[in-house]
C-alpha cells in the first residue's frame, strides 16, 4: 500500500517547468488520456495556486474515483485534500471520513482531519465574532439613535 503525502506537502506548489511537463502529457493524450496521466495532472492541479486550477483537479479526481476501483483510496484522500484547500470543509470531511472508516490509523488522513477541524473551528469562531460585532454595533447605533427613532426599532432593523 503506497503511502500518501501529508496535507502540508500539498501547500507547496510545483514549479512551472514540472507543471508544463504534466500539462503537455495530459493534452498530448487527448481523449485517450490514461488513468495515471489524469491522476498526475489532477494531483498537480491541487498544488497549483489558482482556484480554477484546483477545482479542475478535484473534478478530475472525482472522475477517476467513479471509474477506477483500484485508485479510490488515493482519490478519497486527494478529494478530501482538494476540497479542504478550496474551503469546502463539509466535502473534505466526507471524503476523509470515508477513508478513515476503512483505514482508522492512516496518519495522513488523521492529519487532514485535524486540519479540517481546526479550520472549521476557526471559521466558526470568526462567524460568531462577526455576528457579535454586528450586535454590538447595532446596540451602539440604537442607543445613539434612540432620541430620534426609538432604540428598539433601530436595533430590530440592524439585526434583521
Curated annotation (Swiss-Prot):
GO terms for cellular component: mitochondrial outer membrane; peroxisomal membrane. It comes from the Eukaryota. Keywords: Membrane, Mitochondrion, Mitochondrion outer membrane, Repeat, TPR repeat, Transmembrane, Transmembrane helix. TPR repeats lie at residues 73-106. It is a single-pass membrane protein. Its main location: mitochondrion. Belongs to the FIS1 family. This is Mitochondrial fission 1 protein. It is found in: Mitochondrion outer membrane. The chain crosses the membrane at residues 125-145. Residues 1-124 are cytoplasmic. Residues 146-160 are mitochondrial intermembrane. The keyword Transmembrane helix applies. GO terms for biological process: autophagy of mitochondrion; mitochondrial fission; peroxisome fission. The C-terminus is required for mitochondrial localization, while the N-terminus is necessary for mitochondrial fission.
Amino acid at each position: 500500500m503506497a503511502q500518501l503525502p501529508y496535507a502540508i506537502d500539498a501547500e507547496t506548489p510545483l514549479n512551472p517547468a514540472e507543471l508544463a511537463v504534466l500539462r503537455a502529457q495530459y493534452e498530448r493524450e487527448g481523449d485517450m488520456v490514461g488513468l495515471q496521466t489524469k491522476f498526475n495532472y489532477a494531483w498537480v492541479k491541487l498544488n497549483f495556486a489558482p482556484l480554477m486550477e484546483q477545482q479542475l483537479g478535484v473534478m478530475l479526481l472525482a472522475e477517476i474515483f467513479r471509474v477506477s476501483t483500484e485508485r479510490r483510496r488515493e482519490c478519497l484522500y486527494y478529494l478530501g485534500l482538494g476540497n479542504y484547500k478550496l474551503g469546502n470543509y463539509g466535502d473534505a470531511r466526507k471524503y476523509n471520513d470515508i477513508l478513515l472508516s476503512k483505514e482508522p490509523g492512516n496518519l495522513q488522513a488523521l492529519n487532514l482531519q485535524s486540519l479540517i477541524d481546526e479550520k472549521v473551528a476557526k471559521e466558526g469562531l470568526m462567524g460568531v465574532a462577526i455576528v457579535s460585532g454586528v450586535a454590538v454595533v447595532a446596540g451602539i447605533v440604537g442607543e445613539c439613535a434612540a432620541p430620534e427613532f426609538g432604540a428598539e426599532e433601530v436595533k430590530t432593523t440592524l439585526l434583521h
